[in-house]
A protein has these predicted regions:
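Carboxylate/His-rich catalytic cores and anion/metal-binding grooves
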Residues: 216-237
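Short, compositionally biased P/S/T/A/G/V-rich stretches that sit at domain boundaries
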Residues: 20-30
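Proline-centered turn/helix-capping motifs that create local helix->coil transitions or kinks
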Residues: 233-242, 315-321, 355, 415-416
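Positively charged n-region of N-terminal signal peptides that target proteins for export
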Residues: 1-4
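Hydrophobic h-region of N-terminal signal peptides that target proteins for export
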Residues: 9-18
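Acidic, glycine-anchored loop motifs typical of Ca2+
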Residues: 210, 214
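Aromatic (Trp/Tyr) and acidic
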Residues: 29-97, 101, 107, 123-188, ...
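Solenoid-like repeat scaffolds
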Residues: 367-373
Length: 568
């Protein structure tokens, strides 16, 4: 009897928690295609035959099937309602009791959010005035024409205190610094999708100052960051500075109001190899666009090879922020204790560019034993994507087999998952930047699998990850700013907070639920609503652990959504 009573109490408590945000129906708030299966998830209560779906013409549909699912993370009961393919474009009204919401069905449901996620990079450009940003126009900040060489980066020909110019580039995340590791990784990840879908990007207009030239807007945007990266290589030895930074994070102020001195710090093997990889790729991909960027491909190729030589001579030059003094530096570290994955990516990119045997040998020596989703701390999959893009390449079969092993394991739990998606079914799916590294990048891997097989078997699972991202999840949030009915309004992003505009920059992917809650003591009155892994998210400006934005996270969103949009 006691056990029964306890079970009843827990069940009632769970239902009360589920109803806290007032929505029982969880669905993709952005939209879906008339060629894909749709589903909604009902929190707590079996909808039975009460769920109604009204088509654009007024016809009433019922769910084709209803499946009970119990969350392995919270124990909460949910009901996955399969609606099947909704073949007519328009708005479908979903009702359950007094609750109603809309499912948007269109031929290109992800076009707007994909474009916004790429255009975000224009809005966060450093060193120029933003004049084509509409409400988000702002004066120039951080010209970075007066940057000091930190003593950690000093060399005989560039001693500490040397003034260099290092303009342009993108602000990295919620802060105003620029980091080579993350910048190079972000470009490399987006290049991977560009190589697969170049025709799509050739037609994509993001309304930026360069839109009238002969180069795709996507490549123009990458060039704005590449121009900065070129300045981060020491011209005397080929090593690359780890980052351009202030000693401490700026406050929540606009770029024009920032006053701290900025430095380039310590040359590192990881930054140098990431630089080498992305410059080698850029040399190839910009070759057809000499009219707009004369001489760039040759310059990038030469600088990539020089960087690689420096890395071979300095294989243990890892970033050690705790050793930096006069001044000490406390901004983002992007530290790494292994360069095996960076050597693999850089050697792969340089082999594709030059065909030199030494690079093939190095790629083979540093090749991964299994596929992992791409992150700035493990870039091996960027090398894998390069081998997959090259027909008949030396390591293509090995990389393909590793990818297929990963993808087949990723989809194993979908049939019983609470939100009908490969992502979000275990605690390890959640943490810092999880929506990028584990959702978007997992989906990107699934799309690559179909590309390799010439099928659409895995695309349906990638679409399910998009459903999760856009609202069919435990919090009911669409995790991209400016889209959906319920999206983040207070991201940890300095210009969005300081610009006196109510809405944040659109098209930003936030980090997502993070049970680590590393910022819980810094929330200044805000609080996480739950310790449950998939509910541990708070839409508060102070939440850098769950609500920050970053270029690498948006790069994963661009890579994923542009691929989806290109194949709709």
């Amino acid at each position: 009897m006691k056990k029964t009573l306890l079970t009843l109490v827990l069940a009632c408590a769970a239902m009360a928690m589920q109803a806290k945000d007032g929505t029982q129906i969880r669905r993709n708030q952005v939209g879906c295609s008339p060629r894909q299966e749709s589903a909604v998830v009902i929190e707590g209560t079996n909808p039975g035959s009460k769920l109604r779906v009204k088509t654009p013409s007024g016809k009433v549909l019922k769910a084709k099937s209803v499946r009970k699912a119990v969350s392995p993370l919270s124990g909460k009961v949910r009901y996955v309602c399969n609606l099947g393919v909704l073949p007519t474009t328009g708005d479908y009204r979903v009702t359950l009791g007094t609750e109603e919401c809309v499912l948007h069905v269109s031929d290109h449901p992800y076009r707007d959010v994909a474009t916004a996620s790429l255009r975000l990079f224009y809005l966060i450009r450093s060193g120029i005035a933003i004049e084509m940003g509409g409400d988000y126009n702002r004066p120039m900040g951080h010209p970075d024409t007066y940057v000091l060489v930190h003593n950690s980066a000093a060399s005989p020909l560039r001693p500490a205190g040397t003034v260099i110019s290092s303009p342009y580039g993108w602000y990295d995340a919620g802060d105003y610094n620029k980091y080579v590791v993350n910048s190079a990784f972000s470009i490399g990840l987006m290049f991977a999708t560009y190589e697969q879908k170049a025709d799509y990007f050739a037609q994509l207009n993001t309304n930026i100052p360069e839109s009238r030239n002969q180069t795709p807007d996507f490549l123009d945007e990458m060039m704005f960051n590449l121009r900065w990266l070129l300045t981060m290589q020491d011209p005397y030895d080929g090593g690359v500075y780890h980052k351009l930074t202030t000693p401490n994070f700026e406050g929540f102020i606009m770029p024009k109001d920032c006053r701290q001195t900025r430095y380039v710090v310590q040359k590192t093997v990881t930054a140098t190899l990431d630089f080498a990889a992305v410059m080698a790729d850029a040399a190839r991909l910009f070759e057809p666009y000499q009219q707009d960027y004369p001489g760039f491909s040759a310059q990038a190729a030469a600088m990539a090879e020089r960087a690689y030589r420096w890395a071979k001579e300095n294989p243990r030059a890892f970033y050690r922020q705790e050793q930096l003094r006069e001044p000490a530096v406390t901004t983002g570290g992007y530290g790494d204790g292994s360069a095996t994955d960076e050597f693999f990516w850089a050697a792969t990119a340089l082999y594709r560019l030059t065909g030199k045997q030494q690079y093939l040998d190095d790629a083979r020596q540093n090749a991964p034993r299994s596929f992992t989703t791409p992150s700035w701390g493990n870039v091996a999959s960027l090398g894998a994507f390069e081998w997959l893009a090259a027909e008949g390449s030396a390591l293509r079969e090995t990389m393909c087999n590793q990818l297929m092993d990963y993808c087949n394991k990723a989809i194993e739990g979908v049939a019983t998952s609470s939100f009908q998606s490969p992502y979000g079914n275990k605690k390890s799916d959640f943490g810092w930047g999880c929506l990028a590294e584990f959702n978007c990048c997992q989906a990107l891997a699934l799309l690559y699998a179909d590309q390799m097989l010439g099928t659409e078997k895995y695309r349906r699972y990638a679409l399910q990850n998009a459903d999760y991202l856009f609202g069919r999840n435990a919090t009911g949030y669409c995790y991209v700013t400016g889209f959906g009915d319920k999206s983040p309004m207070h991201p940890h992003h300095r210009p969005s907070e300081a610009d006196a505009i109510e809405k944040p920059f659109p098209g930003m992917l936030v980090g997502g639920p993070n049970p680590g809650q590393q910022d819980r003591k810094d929330l200044n009155g805000a609080a996480y609503p739950s310790n449950i892994a998939d509910e541990s998210y708070v839409d508060a400006m102070q939440s850098y652990a769950s609500n920050e934005i970053a270029i690498n996270w948006n790069a994963s969103l661009v890579a994923f959504l542009c691929w989806l949009d290109a194949t709709d």
